[in-house]
Regions:
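Patatin-like phospholipase
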Residues: 32-40, 45-138, 179-181
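Flexible loop/turn segments at secondary-structure boundaries
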Residues: 45-49, 80-83, 172-174, 266-268, ...
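Active-site gating loop/helix substructures
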Residues: 47, 117-131, 157-275, 429-432
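Conserved N-terminal structural segment that caps and organizes enzyme catalytic cores in eukaryotes
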Residues: 66, 136-159, 164, 177, ...
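Short secondary-structure boundary/capping segments
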Residues: 87-93, 178-185, 219, 273-277, ...
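C-terminal helical/tail subdomains of lipid-metabolizing enzymes
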Residues: 253, 259, 264-267, 272-277, ...
Length: 434
């Protein structure tokens, strides 16, 4: 397929929301027909947040201008925090690849290694001992506004890329999605009144039970509806088409809903992108799943309540994640759906060997993190505390490299929809500044 060079691109000035533009000197190699790329960013605390930042860096570094072709984002917990941080740093607009690599990554590193989100949350709880067992979701939302600058309202987020922020509704046990134009789930119903803080949606998506807890959303303050059209819940039906479908007004079944960590229901954020029967949703050419769920280990036996808690949050959730991951891999390997599954903890040697590219082992593996460092990244605990620079760099580099060698291993020789070269982490060092 011939490639068309584009000599310049438009980039947003840092700190501006689209009023001032400047032409950069970045050279982009643009494909004949752009892909519609969907990103699913999993949960996993700051382990996931930084891993995903590294994955995004690999996409931004690609010569095919893939970053501008990101059309859909579906995020959970740490993935939602990652996306919210990127938007906040860039004035609540999706950045250019150049701005992401040269400005946003370094700013995100500084913020995550100087501001202690978890410590601030704990200090707030200790100041109010009478409510220490209550949900801390409201506190997390406020800290995201104060410490990370997540000050926009949900409805102010641009419609492109289309961003689904996934939570779990306790009352319906379904995947509750926050979008700029609507929120809700197909059992409870939907509301177009999304005049609420973006930080609230992020806090709900990251509200792990027992650690942060649920966001209580009062329903009587908004109008709600259901679609009469059977396919209207498809999140990737165009907004213009959705607005032509008939709706039925409804009275909320509950005066408030409690919205928990999206990872309780679907830690990969796949339900809005993938259907078990039909594969990718409409208008998705390439699905990129970034899975930083972490690795499970065998804990010592726990009795009574602790045993039950592990059964629910450990074994059962791990099985749900495994089933969804297998379904995606089946679509990629056995059907026509194109995409890639990027798993934390996968080393270069493992990925190239499984892809039957053993001839590349001596060339590329020495350029990547060794097995010990990869294992350290995968075993990093699920938390939202301040990171050291070494911790950030470990997780970020691992995310970049997993994306780099996985995309190369499985898409180097194909033209549908993209060919990926191995870039190596050193290729972006000068741009990211560390």
């Amino acid at each position: 397929m011939p490639e068309v060079p584009v000599l310049a691109c438009i980039a947003l000035d840092q700190g501006k929301i689209g009023n001032v533009h400047q032409v950069t000197s970045q050279v982009i190699i643009k494909k004949e027909a752009d892909m519609k790329i969907a990103l699913a960013l999993s949960g996993g605390g700051f382990r996931a947040t930084v891993f995903h930042l590294g994955v995004l860096a690999r996409i931004a570094a690609d010569e095919q201008d893939l970053f501008s072709q990101v059309t859909y984002l579906s995020t959970v917990s740490g993935g939602s925090l990652c996306t919210g941080l990127v938007y906040s740093i860039n004035g609540f607009r999706w950045p250019t690849a150049k701005d992401y690599l040269e400005q946003i990554v370094l700013t995100a590193r500084r913020m995550m290694t100087t501001y202690d989100l978890q410590g601030s949350l704990l200090r707030r709880a200790l100041r109010h001992l009478g409510s220490i067992l209550e949900t801390r979701s409201d506190d997390l939302s406020e800290l995201l506004r104060e410490g990370w600058g997540v000050t926009a309202q949900l409805h102010e987020v641009p419609s492109h890329p289309r961003w689904l922020i996934n939570a779990t509704c306790y009352e319906t046990a379904k995947n509750w999605r926050f979008e700029p134009h609507r929120m809700g789930d197909y059992v409870f119903g939907y509301s177009r009144d999304t005049n609420l803080p973006l930080a609230d949606a992020l806090a709900a998506s990251a509200g792990f039970p027992g650690l942060i807890g649920a966001l209580a959303l009062k329903t009587g303050e908004r109008t709600w509806f259901r679609y009469k059209h059977s396919g209207a819940e498809d999140p990737y039906t165009s907004l213009a088409v959705q607005q032509t479908w008939e709706t039925t007004p409804i009275t909320p079944a509950f005066p408030e809903v409690h919205l928990w960590d999206g990872g309780v229901y679907d830690n990969h954020g796949l339900e809005g992108l993938h259907d078990f029967s039909h594969g990718w949703r409409n208008n998705v050419d390439f699905l990129l799943v970034s899975d930083a769920s972490g690795t499970s280990s065998a804990p010592p036996y726990r009795q009574r309540v602790k045993a039950l808690y592990f059964m629910v949050t450990g074994i059962m959730m791990d099985q749900i994640r495994s089933l969804r991951a297998r379904a995606v891999l089946d679509r990629i390997t056995q059907h026509d759906d194109d995409g890639s599954y990027l798993k934390i903890g996968n080393s270069c040697h493992k990925v190239l060997t499984e892809a039957r590219r053993t001839q590349d082992l001596e060339t590329y593996c020495p350029m990547c993190m060794d097995e010990t460092a990869v294992s350290q990244a995968a075993a990093f605990p699920t938390m939202i505390r301040k990171l050291s620079q070494a911790e950030f760099d470990l997780l970020f580099r691992h995310g970049f490299e997993v994306a780099d060698y996985t995309l190369y291993a499985h898409h180097a020789d194909t033209s549908l929809p993209a060919r990926f070269k191995f870039l190596g982490y050193e290729s972006i060092r000068n741009q990211i500044g560390f």
